[in-house]
Regions:
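Binding/recognition "hotspot" determinant
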Residues: 1-68
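Hydrophobic transmembrane alpha-helix segments characteristic of membrane transport
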Residues: 68-104, 196-210
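Alpha-helical transmembrane segments
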Residues: 201-218, 239-243
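Structural signature of hydrophobic alpha-helical transmembrane segments
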Residues: 63-71, 159-166, 191, 223
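Alpha-helical transmembrane segments and their helix-start/interface "positive-inside/aromatic belt" motifs
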Residues: 3-21, 92-108, 213-220
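Transmembrane helix-bundle signature of multi-pass membrane transporters/permeases
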Residues: 216-224, 255, 259
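Hydrophobic alpha-helical transmembrane segments
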Residues: 52-73, 94-108, 112, 124
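Non-cytosolic segments of integral membrane proteins
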Residues: 10, 14, 21-25, 104-196, ...
Length: 262
């Protein structure tokens, strides 16, 4: 009898600990996860970030980029003189000057270009979420997803981590917690690649460095378009029947959460 009471007490303690932990995770996640995932122009509306980037060509990283622009010009001038001496074929002066002017202007407008590109990307993901909102009658967001998943699992007072519903609740909470780290890293990486935008554009002036722009562009596109993919996955998840008695719905929701983590 004492062993039975001890076992029950241990189980209740474990359930209480995990219930408190998962409840804390849930109340923390929904307030930040949407902001981290669905990036908009607010990511650039930071005075410190603007100073680091450089609102004009006279401050921030744009100063370094413009200095490198002068460096590319000197490098080409030396190559041109050397080519005349060694009778080598290099890029014609008017071609280089044309590229220098075009990419120099684009480079100094890179902050504006990034701002507009982020707004377009945000518009696409918001459009997908708006379609879902019109269909299902509620927001397509992580905060709404957490509310639905809490309904899908079980009531807090009945939480039992050793039950099927308890395992589902545990998996969902831990997965969403992992999403915070993944999308926080993505948020930081987007900022990093925005900061190096002037240097990526500058690399197009010389054919030997143009690979840097291609790598930068592929990475930026994959980072930004990820939020449209997340919006589509959320749309699919919300199409499921959220019922605690429907095991298939529970498994499909777990599959959707797993897809978000991956």
């Amino acid at each position: 009898m004492e062993n039975s009471n001890l076992t029950t007490s241990i189980i209740e303690t474990i359930n209480s600990i995990f219930e408190t932990l998962f409840s804390s995770i849930d109340t923390t996640i929904y307030s930040v996860l949407d902001e981290l995932t669905f990036i908009d122009k607010n990511i650039l509306n930071n005075s410190i970030f603007q100073k680091i980037f450089g609102s004009t060509g006279n401050n921030g990283l744009l100063v370094i980029a413009n200095s490198l622009l002068v460096g590319f010009s000197l490098y080409y001038a030396i190559r041109l003189i050397y080519s005349y001496y060694m009778n080598l074929q290099i890029e014609r002066p008017y071609q280089f000057i044309f590229k220098l002017l075009i990419f120099g202007i684009v480079m100094n407008c890179s902050y504006f270009i990034c701002n507009q590109f982020i707004q377009i990307n945000s518009f696409i993901s918001d459009a997908i979420r708006t379609v879902g909102s019109n269909i299902f009658g509620h927001d397509i967001s992580f905060s709404e997803l957490i509310n639905k998943l809490n309904y899908l699992s079980i009531k807090e007072k009945e939480f039992n981590i050793f039950s099927f519903d308890g395992l589902i609740k545990s998996f969902i909470s831990i997965s969403l917690f992992n999403l915070i780290f993944s999308y926080s890293l993505r948020y930081i990486m987007v900022k990093v690649f925005i900061l190096i935008t002037p240097f990526a554009i500058l690399s197009l002036i010389n054919e030997s460095t143009s690979w840097f722009f291609k790598t930068w562009l592929k990475t930026v596109l994959s980072l930004l378009f990820q939020q449209s993919l997340v919006a589509i996955i959320l749309l699919i998840i919300f199409s499921f029947n959220f019922s605690s008695n429907n095991i298939i719905s529970q498994l499909m929701c777990i599959g959707g959460i797993y897809a978000l983590v991956r």
